[in-house]
Amino acid sequence: MGLVIFLALIVLILIIGLRIFKAFMILVWHPFVLTRRLKNQGISGPNYRIFYGNLSEIKKMKRESHLSILDPSSNDIFPRILPHYQKWMSQYGETFLYWNGTEPRICISDPELAKTMLSNKLGFFVKSKARPEAVKLVGSKGLVFIEGADWVRHRRILNPAFSIDRLKIMTTVMVDCTLKMLEEWRKESTKEETEHPKIKKEMNEEFQRLTADIIATSAFGSSYVEGIEVFRSQMELKRCYTTSLNQVSIPGTQYLPTPSNIRVWKLERKMDNSIKRIISSRLQSKSDYGDDLLGILLKAYNTEGKERKMSIEEIIHECRTFFFGGHETTSNLLAWTTMLLSLHQDWQEKLREEIFKECGKEKTPDSETFSKLKLMNMVIMESLRLYGPVSALAREASVNIKLGDLEIPKGTTVVIPLLKMHSDKTLWGSDADKFNPMRFANGVSRAANHPNALLAFSVGPRACIGQNFVMIEAKTVLTMILQRFRFISLCDEYKHTPVDNVTIQPQYGLPVMLQPLED
């Protein structure tokens, strides 16, 4: 009996010893070796702190930067949103190493290196590890996070949903939803008993509601009312994610029944139940499922053969992905473009003149119209440059690999700070921080000193599948608004405080004064 106890103690000591050794390797030895290895290549950065890395510094800098309020005419938002990048770039150069907990991250801002990494088709750079809260938001089995053969299968199934013919059909939905919003604005303006009535609108909220209605109707055949629970759950999950961003992520803790985890689980369950109701409604009402995004996904569920088949769980996760991405990206693009046009009345008038010339004052826009709206395209591209959807892109090296002259160790995350690249004066000229749509007069590839200086939708095989949808939606909405209303000015209470809440958005909303155009 004593021997059994002795052997059990030996085994226990060995297990504990191995755990301690593993923790030592992760927390101390690997960071030490990697730091020295990169230092030999001339790459340095802030000192690594055991367990936390540089998260405490990042949290402090972000907290301080979020107290600042920018001048509305300032488009230099990089220091406010990514203050740690700005500080460390000034100290260590544009390529530096920092630590997100125990995760090593190398920052690069060279567009050629960015293009090489994002265009890799061999799986050498994969999506970097995401926090559990982010995965819950759009699903682990959706297009955002899956890799390899699964990603190829999903992309092949989903591509037809964003074909030119399908987008033409979606445009009619965009027009109908926008007309509803504009009719509400018109009714509100008629209540003003003045010769030149004005109305005040919180444009960020207006665009969030509109784009949610459009994606729910055009992609899922539901409506904003039916999809409202999905959107509400996702907004709550987004808040959970942004709250956790600057905290150390300990593997396994997402399974513990903590108050925050229980809240996330409830929201996830609520969101999926709402999606299941939409799916069930479609299954009962249509024998052929339809040809929109949801219909294409359901056809994949009943398809024979692995190459074109999807499970119900995969369909639910893709629905999460497109419910979120389908309205968040465009609503922010519309909000920032509205802000810029409110500040730059000359460009607002140029767009209106172009719209009246090519589309008239009442004709609803269509795919033929969009190809003629050159100035509109230039303004939207400039808005994407200054206030893109995301602040940075990240990929993890799945093998030891060379990127340019850099030897990137396996497991290292490479980060491209898009806000820095999109405002770099060496790429965009001395007016890089100014609103100047004319830089896109000869197309995107000639707007800067490098053809891939603008990465708002990324490049390569994992470029945003919905970028054409976003562009057409933005053009549709802006065209119809400018046909009927004028952005007079930003309201006095507007605070220019762009913030990174998964996507870049106005921290305190976007109140704008509008005036209906005279007939």
UniProtKB/Swiss-Prot annotation:
Origin: domain of life: Eukaryota
Uppermost EC category: oxidoreductase
PROSITE patterns, alphabetized: CYTOCHROME_P450 (PS00086)
InterPro entries associated with the record: Cyt_P450, Cyt_P450_CS, Cyt_P450_E_grp-I, Cyt_P450_sf, Cytochrome_P450_Monooxygen
Deleted gene: phenotype: No visible phenotype under normal growth conditions.
Molecular function, one GO term: heme binding
Membrane topology field: Single-pass membrane protein
Keyword hit for Transmembrane: yes
Keywords annotated in UniProt: Heme, Iron, Membrane, Metal-binding, Monooxygenase, Oxidoreductase, Stress response, Transmembrane, Transmembrane helix
Cofactor(s) for this UniProt protein: heme
Family indicated by similarity: Belongs to the cytochrome P450 family.
Name under which the protein is recorded: Cytochrome P450 709B1
Organism: Arabidopsis thaliana (Mouse-ear cress)
